[in-house]
Regions:
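Active-site acidic/histidine proton-transfer and metal-coordination neighborhood
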Residues: 49, 69-175
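N-terminal small/glycine-rich loop or linker at the start of catalytic domains
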Residues: 1-9, 55-65, 100-111
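Active-site-adjacent beta->alpha loops and helix N-cap segments on the catalytic face
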Residues: 37-47
Length: 259
């Protein structure tokens, strides 16, 4: 099983670049973070190589929204830079948000001045365009719905709000990033939703409810979800721990390794 550590949630007592060797030291092979643009990607590349780590994903957007017609030109330009960064860092997955998340995960704009028809049309247009680039470059776009509890004003807040557009785009390189924590908050019915979208799910984010802590600390039946994903649906992608420890880091690490 491929397990990734989100270093913007874990090992946060350490400086950013010191978290990479800690991921390897604690026995994990994959690492991920949000925006690449505020970091030294040459240093990150060296740290990945020195610690024999694979970069699972990072955000392909930052300051420009997928859903806003006024952002289309800048969105595409930044995405192309993200593609270059992905190749440099040997990363196969770029996360795409309806509302771009900038430094420290801050949502840039909510787009509340736009109607739903405009947002859907713009998101579809932009995804069609960047999907062609992703296919040509051998990359995967992981479209992530996010809860309004975490990002008030975010547009794609349910699995269907992203899945419907992904299916219209129809590219094998455009997938659904299913964040179990966010989707439990927004819609529940996790197993049926996973089964319904098994053909397009490309990446899993893990965190329990409430609090976004390690599996087993909240209300979600993670052993059963894992069984459904792996044994029933044959999911072989990355399970990423985007969470913070409920008690101690040692206890959290033990739980993540046992997952």
């Amino acid at each position: 099983m491929k397990k990734s550590i989100c270093i913007e949630k874990l090992f946060v007592d350490l400086p950013f670049y010191d978290r990479f060797p800690m991921v390897r030291k604690t026995g994990f092979d994959y690492v991920e973070f949000g925006s690449w643009a505020q970091h030294d990607i040459k240093k990150i590349k060296s740290l990945l190589e020195e610690n024999r780590l694979q970069l699972g994903c990072f955000s392909g957007d930052k300051d420009y929204n997928l859903i806003d017609p006024a952002h289309c030109k800048e969105f595409l330009e930044y995405f192309k830079r993200s593609v270059e960064a992905a190749h440099f860092l040997d990363c196969k997955n770029l996360v795409i948000h309806s509302n771009a998340l900038g430094e420290e995960g801050r949502m840039c704009t909510d787009g509340n001045d736009l109607n739903d028809r405009t947002k859907i049309a713009c998101a579809t247009k932009n995804l069609l365009e960047i999907s062609k680039i992703a296919e040509a470059e051998g990359l995967y776009l992981q479209v992530e719905p996010v809860s309004t509890y975490a990002k008030p004003g975010y547009y794609m807040t349910t699995s269907d709000s992203a899945a419907d557009i992904i299916r219209v785009v129809g590219s094998p390189n455009v997938k659904l990033l299913y964040d179990i924590y966010h989707m439990q908050l927004m819609e529940g019915d996790l197993v049926n939703t996973l089964r319904r979208n098994a053909d397009i799910i490309g990446y899993i984010h893990i965190g329990d409810v409430p609090g976004r802590h390690e599996p087993g600390t909240g209300e979600i039946n993670y052993p059963y979800l894992k069984h459904v994903l792996v044994d029933e649906l044959g999911f072989d992608g990355i399970f990423a721990f985007e969470l913070s420890p409920l008690t101690t880091m040692d206890a959290c690490l033990e739980t993540m390794h046992a997952f």
